[in-house]
Regions:
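Class I S-adenosyl-L-methionine-dependent methyltransferase catalytic core
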Residues: 1-11, 18-201, 205-254
């Protein structure tokens, strides 16, 4: 509950977009900043794309159901087994990576941009689960007892995620009433197009976690980075929040 009348909100540390999403459900126009391009993409997709999808619900759902069928019955991945992936191949079993890349190819071939973005988010949402990695605070290699064989079933997890998204579009997309607007990756450099009534945020956690490195699999999958060498460049744009984060980086605005 917001105790004042609010028509516009700014979220300087967007994260996964909780504040803009709730604002949009109340019909409040929101603006946000987020240094992680993958997280910014997720936020825009689950608000703006889902809102737009509600206007052409049947078409979007039909496309997603067709994609689901192609992934389950017609996925051509054998020729991708053993491909190099700019050093990221070490994080996956060879067949898992081949299937991820085959599904990504199907997604990129979709002609409908809303369905394409929704499907990208669906694929990115399973990438850690089907990899050799696990998130326990930070992203790290999973120990032998931390993964089950079914965790590596790419087609199962992707199609299950599509089912969840199709349900949400069918029954909940009308709850998203207002768009959100990405203004700048860095909150310190953001220029808002108008005065806002309210700033609501969950500031960066003081825990030393590197949220760029934590999403490196998603960043790579959706082509926000090519190699791990680009991660420090993205990370340097963030606000240092934790003693373990302090480094000798230069020329970082305060």
């Amino acid at each position: 509950h917001i105790p004042i009348e609010v028509k516009t909100i700014y979220e300087p540390f967007g994260g996964s977009g909780t504040t803009p999403l709730v604002a949009s459900q109340f019909g409040i126009q929101s603006y946000f900043s987020e240094i992680n391009p993958f997280m910014a993409f997720v936020t825009k997709t689950k608000i703006n794309t889902v809102k737009a999808a509600n206007q052409k619900k049947e078409q979007i759902i039909t496309i997603l159901l067709k994609l689901k069928e192609d992934v389950m019955k017609n996925l051509k991945f054998e020729h991708l087994i053993g491909v190099t992936y700019d050093g990221f191949e070490k994080y996956y079993k060879t067949e898992v990576l081949a299937k991820l890349l085959a599904i990504k190819k199907l997604i990129l071939e979709l002609n409908e941009p809303l369905a394409k973005n929704i499907s990208k988010v669906a694929l990115a949402s399973i990438v850690v689960k089907v990899s050799n990695m696990i998130k326990r605070g930070d992203l790290r290699y999973a120990k032998e007892n931390e993964k089950k064989e079914e965790d590596f079933d790419v087609q199962l997890h992707f199609t299950n995620k599509l089912d969840e998204i199709i349900y949400d579009i069918d029954f909940h997309s009308e709850s998203v009433q207002s768009d959100t607007h990405f203004v700048h990756s860095d909150a310190r450099l953001a220029t808002l197009p108008q005065e806002v009534d309210c700033v609501i945020t969950s500031p960066p956690y003081l825990n030393g976690t590197n949220y760029i490195r934590n999403t490196k699999l998603e960043l790579k999958l959706l082509d926000f980075i090519k190699s791990e060498k680009e991660l420090p460049i993205l990370h340097s744009g963030g606000i240092m929040a934790g003693i373990n984060s302090v480094s000798k980086r230069r020329n970082i605005p305060i």
